Regions:
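Active-site pocket-lining/capping segments in soluble small-molecule metabolic enzymes
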Residues: 2-182, 192-335
């Protein structure tokens, strides 16, 4: 019987007994990425606690530079109002103004999702939406913004608050060009708006990403990387309109809105979500390698959806995309 051979173990594959520090806590493939998170008015307490715990344990401030969301007011769009209704704004003694100020003091901008696809001139005097707008604009924080779809609302806000940044909502690019968006179309948006949320289908359009990269304007775009909708969904625009219709028709004065489950409403069979009917199809959620590919084209701002997601889902996305994988990601759920 031959003696057993001893196999040399390479120590460079063993984990260190000390955690990374500084930027070492971030995903090593995308270290300069900054993030825009769907937590405003929904996951505020959880995000504040997470940021504070991370700073205490790792002496590092995570690169979350913006949050987005909105109460269920008439101008809101993109998502239904389930979570907004579940979390009243005074649940911790906070008002919208206090929350925005807390974010701004942390170096985090706030973006309202004023992305209703069906607004007309007659909706511009909505008191609840204007109330929120006035609060946001009065903070005079350069990172605050509104995400818009309808030109009439964009023009109205630009006239009232010319210094308030505007972002192009995914709802707008879906409404304008529901099936395929061109580089020329995106260029036209860059001429009018400060920032553009890149349609999640377009994260996989390598020719378009290269054109944007070559234009030198990648810093104006914010790709959405964890969109759970079916890739190339053919009824996305119908879903957005259904949500918007529910917002407009569900208003009962100030912040009193009825809630509509637009995905499963039997009277609207044309807008039943393909995720339910065809679960075998891939979603727009990017793999880590796909995320790195977008990053390598020069994009540095990235969006995490979260307005209709539980907090655990947001933590999962932090651990998947933002954090270092060997040491830090697995600790995310312990903070």
């Amino acid at each position: 019987m031959e003696p057993k051979k001893h196999v040399a173990i390479s120590t460079d594959k063993l984990k260190s007994n000390r955690l990374p520090t500084g930027k070492g806590v971030l995903n090593k493939d995308t270290p300069d990425a900054v993030y825009d998170v769907g937590s405003l008015f929904i996951h505020d307490k959880q995000l504040f606690n997470f940021l504070d715990a991370f700073k205490t344990l790792h002496d590092y401030v995570l690169p979350i530079k913006s949050v987005f969301g909105c109460y269920g007011v008439k101008w809101m769009g993109g998502r239904n109002t389930n979570y907004q209704q579940m979390v009243p704004w005074n649940h911790q003694g906070w008002t919208p103004e206090v929350l925005i100020q807390e974010y701004n003091q942390r170096g985090i901008g706030c973006t309202y999702t004023f992305s209703n696809t069906l607004l007309t001139e007659k909706d511009l005097d909505d008191p609840s939406s204007n109330y929120l707008l006035d609060i946001l604009a009065s903070q005079n924080y350069s990172g605050n913004a509104v995400a818009v779809t309808q030109d009439c609302l964009s023009d109205y806000i630009r006239k009232r608050y010319p210094d308030l940044k505007q972002k192009v909502s995914v709802c707008k690019s879906t409404k304008d060009m529901p099936h395929k968006r061109t580089f020329e179309y995106y260029e036209s948006l860059c001429d009018k708006f400060e920032l553009v949320y890149l349609h999640p289908d377009d994260n996989l359009n390598l020719k378009l990403l290269e054109q944007i990269s070559d234009s030198g304007k990648a810093e104006k775009y914010i790709p959405l990387i964890n969109e759970r909708c079916t890739w190339n969904c053919q009824i996305r625009n119908n879903h957005y309109d259904e949500t918007s219709k529910a917002q407009i028709e569900g208003w009962h004065g100030m912040f009193n809105f009825s809630n509509v489950d637009f995905i499963h409403t039997p009277s609207h069979p044309k807008t039943i979500c393909p995720r339910i009917l065809m679960p075998h199809l891939r979603t727009c959620v990017l793999s880590r390698s796909e995320f790195k590919r977008v990053y390598d084209f020069g994009f540095r701002r990235f969006k995490f959806q979260g307005r209709d997601s539980p907090w655990a889902s947001i933590l999962y996305n932090f651990s998947t995309y933002m954090l270092e994988q060997d040491y830090i990601a697995e600790k995310t759920f312990t903070y």
